[in-house]
Amino acid sequence: MVISYAIPVCNEHVELEKLLLFLVKHIDKNDEIVIQCDQGNTTPEVYRVLDSFKAPVGLKDPLKIIEFPLKGHFSNFKNNLKEHCIGDWIFQIDADELPNESLITNLKELLKLNPTVEMFLVPRVNTVSGLTQEHINKWRWNINEKGWINWPDYQTRIIQNSQKIKWQNRVHEQIVGISTKGALPLSEEWCLYHPKTIEKQEIQNNFYDSL
């Protein structure tokens, strides 16, 4: 079994470096990491991070790097990323997210035990540093005792690599073509971590409002 870890990126160079260091260390050698840059908008800092992972001459690079313009159409962007993945499964991870180590370690065994499931939802731990009660009220967020926002915030991220499965909608994209789906356990050990600052959260909200 081969898993393609598919990562869209634009300007998240600090978070991307952490994610790539983690994946290179923990995934199987036959798996692949596919990075898709937002063509024309990806920052020089991101390219410097990607360059730092290049293998010496004669050795295989650990990353497959492609370019495609986002142009505000998230489904087209992710569908193009999917087309460059060769794995049996695709795990789409945003550049500013980080999987729990247990999720990566145990993922293949879970997939083997559920061969008829075509998509898995992944719980996500959202945290925002600098968050105030005013922000919470404004965005109507639910915060638990650990400071996690809208837990479990399940994300549709792990899919079989099938031609019938794709994303649709320009914004707030959804996966279609799924016959059977499941959810990873409601536990931190199976989660994605998604930390942000309040400044980045407000920039993101304003960006989505402009689309």
Predicted regions and their residues:
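Acidic donor-binding segment of Leloir-type glycosyltransferases
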Residues: 21-67
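Amphipathic, non-transmembrane alpha-helical secondary structure
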Residues: 17-24, 83
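Catalytic-site signature of metal-activated, phosphate-bearing donor transferases
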Residues: 74-82, 98-211
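Short amphipathic alpha-helical segments
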Residues: 18-20, 47-48, 103-105, 133
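Short beta-strand-to-loop acidic/aromatic patch adjacent to the donor-nucleotide binding site
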Residues: 87-98
